[in-house]
Amino acid sequence: MGQTKLNYLYRKNQDLFGSFLNESSVKLGHQDYFGAIEAVTKAINLNNKYPIPFIRRAEIRYKIKDYKNANDDLSEAFKFKKNCPENYLFRAYFLAYSINKNLENSKDAIINLEKAINLRNTSKAKIWPIEIYYLYEKKGDFLRESGKYDNAIFEYSKAILSGINNPLAKTRLHYKRGWLNYYEINYAYAINDFSIAIKKGKQIDKYHYFMARGFSFIKINNLEKAIEDFKNALECNQLAIEFYKDFFLNFVPKETCDLVVIYFGVNLEKWS
């Protein structure tokens, strides 16, 4: 076969490869997920040594909760990661974290999340689909759910110090870290976190922050400030104390609960 014909066949193959990927994107845009998978599979059948189609198929399969096959696709993609653009490799690592979390494979989930964080931190790229604070927050969430509160606090702190420009996200992080500081008996730090959340948070959510700080004040025997915070919480939401009834009953001394009941006129029957 002559070189000219070989070049022609190569170009034709590449054109088909690109057209199948485009077809997949169009079908995905119309939420035809199975049609999109079929199209990208045709591209893979033409060239199964290129990582991007595997990543794209994994993303589609993730949308339809086909986690096992999505994970298999990423395993294939990672075989060719040396030829993978950083933005796609980052997407693949974060997707692998999400998939393995859904598969309850905690070890692989955290490994891939750390790879995404490391790539994000070492790359010279300026534009990323996910802010670094969000990655630290997800790692903190993961560690919190695993009961590793000290490590989770460390990750939330990195998120807060990462130059985050989203005030609502920053408030959320202080609130999360505040509760972990509470459970780790770091009450002064918890009070500071909740105070920041009160200052920066949306009005509709502030009753949560006031209640949390009030519980922290109870732990350092400052009932006067605790009562003041509970009062502020009620001004934000008249059902604030009722919302935290179980917390009062399980984590607050009975004499303090009785004081709150008397001071705020809570229905005693609901607390029995």
What are these regions (language model features)?
Residues 1-272:
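Alpha-helical tetratricopeptide repeat
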